[in-house]
Amino acid sequence: MRLPRTSGILLHPTSLPGPHGAGDLGPAAYHFVDWLQSAGQKLWQILPLGGVGPGNSPYMSSSAFAGNVLLIDLAELASCGWLTDADLVPDPAFRDDRIDYAAVIPWRMARLARAAQACAEHATPAQRAAYEAFCAEHASWLEDYALFMALAEAHPGRDWADWPAMLARREPAALRSAATAHAERIAFWRFGQWCFFRQWQRLRAYANARGISIVGDAPIFIAPQSADVWARQDLFELDTDGRQRVVAGVPPDYFSATGQRWGNPLYRWSAHAADGYAWWTERVRHTFTLVDIVRIDHFRGFAAYWEIPASEPTAVHGRWLPGPGLALFEAIAKALGPLPIIAEDLGIITPDVDALRRATQLPGMRVLQFAFGGGADNLYLPHHHEAATVVYTGTHDNDTTQGWWRAASQAERDHVARYLGRRADELDTDIHWTLIRMAWASVADTAITPLQDVLGLDAAHRMNLPGEGDGHWAWRFDWSQVRPAHGEQLAALTQMYARG
């Protein structure tokens, strides 16, 4: 499905300013939408909206359907009468420029628990009706999620496969008993989702009303310690005890001699095919209730994926296996119709991957930071772009453009300079705007840049470094960094290259 000629900014809500240690769905999110509109932008791209997992990654969430309760605007809960002004006083340890998850998570969760209790005791009839309607509408995933989260709390530090066997195997009598024993915590997790969904939908409606579409992100793989894997063990490559036989990753390449062992469970694609890809169809349908456009991560895994024995410590000793291919996308399209999906086709892209993307008619991705290694045949260079493409200066996995430039080889720097007809030393101060202009000028239908590049920030402001487990996903900006000239220059480029 072709996308209109537009442009936008990549920024996860956790990176927004705010007093409570991490960005959330409060006033700063609405201010950011207003800024996007004033800068002439039409897209706000985010990372996955689920809760953070190991290493605080949003790509390892405990559910493919649930939202991140850490994003809940606590001030809005106070306006409902569920928190006090004293509850909203920030911890002095909170930082404006980085998220200290070790401090933020317990602080926010304690206040969410207080709000849940107050709501249970003092909710109005209208609030109770809205809560019950939400629970009924989302029961297909919400009940498993809430029970899973309650059981995970009751068995701290243990994989679900190490829970009592009756719970790990999901024996009905054991589940009923657990639901009774953990009723209060189950209600808490339901409440958190209700708060997240109503706040998120309000923000999304605000953005849509101002001409801003939300670009979401759907990881191909699911976290092993997730409600999805526990609830649908038949759909994943697990042994009879619920343990992973094989895990996901990518093989060794130029950047990594041992590859990347992600550790996600792999899909049992034969089981998905047997029921017409119902789980995937429902996942995609649900995702589109939250966002307007979806980027599917690691698209190449649908053509073929790298299978690694779970016993292997690295990704070296794996093998390629065929993915579901076109059949999955045909099943989704048959059920849901044509959808605005972006295929993240970065990495090892073989002819079968490109053929699948073209058969699905999904736009792929081009990243300009990858364009200047090699010669004129590098497909990331703008003269090779196609209209059905999304071009980025960099993604959340890249360095900032200023950081990339400072670390680039002399050959890369010279290539950029020759390509632009300039001297390399002339680009030191404005390389970020140079790449933004290059992206906006591209024939690609969609152009996106991280906010860090608009602000000209260096490598210290990078969002993620793949393969490094700690210290990432923590970057935040402050409005003092955003000058009027930033929005004005972005708006001028957007108008110049007909992306408004």
Specify the residue positions occupied by each region the protein language model found.
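Mature N-terminal, pre-catalytic/accessory segment of carbohydrate-active enzymes
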Residues: 1-40
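Surface-exposed amphipathic alpha-helices with a cationic face
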Residues: 37, 200-208, 333, 357
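Outer-envelope exported proteins of Gram-negative bacteria
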Residues: 47, 213-215, 219, 293, ...
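Terminal-tail/helix-coil boundary detector
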Residues: 479-500
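Alpha-amylase-like alpha-glycosidases and glucanotransferases acting on alpha-linked glucans and related
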Residues: 1-5, 10-12, 55-197, 222-448, ...
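Catalytic domains of carbohydrate-active enzymes, especially glycoside hydrolases
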Residues: 27-52, 289-291, 439-441
